[in-house]
């Protein structure tokens, strides 16, 4: 199996130029599915901290870069929405956030903010012992004793303790950002949630400073004011 794929075939979310070199790295197994960007692409093409895969491998072998507070074993580890990248030697920290057009970008944050990660609850299941398991947008999950969360909610998880430190409900009036579709990167408040019959996708109407927009409910993630303030810095 090849470790490269043609640049013209990569997902639109990848922050790479499609008309330069023919091939780019292929994301390995891991979170975020097909939308995940290989870590080496972020280090080489976005941040320009390394020149090649060998330098990227050295960086992860020496814990020069951490993802969500953890060491990384594979330069092709997929990086995706809301992941936290930390560069301890540089004292630099970034959150992965979609820009206008849906491509993944990096927002610089401080060390305190880098200690936790925002997760969208896609659904929940009951596991052994009657515990509730929250399933998140990146494929990760968290088992809890309490059942206080719903699909569409967002939770902030401490990367050291794996405990939920904040909870934002998916409801009218909630602050959201669109992470896909033509409004990706836009931020506003949910004005209306429209539940569609059958298999049709639910939609939301969002009010923002540009007059608002309507999009598929799956495309929005609930955030809070602190999140916006950090991204504006």
From Swiss-Prot:
Bridged cysteine pairs (disulfide): none
Organism domain of life: Archaea
GO biological process annotation, one example: translation
Residue span(s) of domain S4 RNA-binding: 37-99
Any one GO molecular-function label of the UniProt entry: RNA binding
Transmembrane segments: none
Transport as UniProt keyword: no
GO cellular component, one term: cytosolic small ribosomal subunit
Keywords: Ribonucleoprotein, Ribosomal protein, RNA-binding, rRNA-binding
Record's keyword annotation contains RNA-binding: yes
PANTHER family found in the cross-reference section: 30S/40S RIBOSOMAL PROTEIN S4, SMALL RIBOSOMAL SUBUNIT PROTEIN ES4
Family the UniProt entry places it in: Belongs to the eukaryotic ribosomal protein eS4 family.
Protein name: Small ribosomal subunit protein eS4
Species per Swiss-Prot/TrEMBL record: Halobacterium salinarum (strain ATCC 700922 / JCM 11081 / NRC-1) (Halobacterium halobium)
UniProt lineage: Archaea, Methanobacteriati, Methanobacteriota, Stenosarchaea group, Halobacteria
């Amino acid at each position: 199996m090849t470790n490269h794929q043609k640049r013209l075939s990569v997902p639109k979310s990848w922050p790479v130029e499609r008309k330069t070199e023919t091939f780019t790295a292929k994301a390995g197994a891991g979170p975020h599915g097909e939308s995940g960007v290989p870590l080496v692409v972020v280090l080489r093409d976005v941040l320009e901290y390394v020149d090649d895969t060998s330098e990227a491998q050295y960086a992860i072998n020496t814990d020069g870069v951490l993802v969500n507070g953890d060491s990384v074993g594979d330069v092709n580890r997929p990086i995706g929405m809301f992941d936290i990248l930390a560069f301890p030697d540089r004292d630099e920290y970034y959150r992965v956030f979609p820009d206008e057009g849906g491509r993944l970008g990096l927002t610089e944050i401080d060390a305190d903010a880098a200690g936790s990660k925002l997760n969208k609850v896609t659904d929940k299941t009951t596991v052994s012992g009657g515990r509730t398991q929250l399933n998140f947008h990146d494929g990760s999950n968290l088992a809890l004793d309490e059942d206080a969360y719903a699909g569409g909610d967002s939770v902030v998880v401490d990367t050291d303790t794996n405990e939920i430190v904040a909870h934002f409900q998916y409801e009218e009036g909630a602050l959201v950002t669109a992470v896909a579709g033509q409004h990706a990167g836009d931020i506003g408040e949910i004005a209306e949630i429209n539940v569609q019959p059958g298999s049709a996708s639910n939609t939301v109407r969002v009010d923002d400073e540009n007059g608002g927009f309507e999009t598929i409910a799956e495309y929005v993630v609930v955030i809070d004011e602190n999140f916006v303030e950090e991204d504006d810095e």
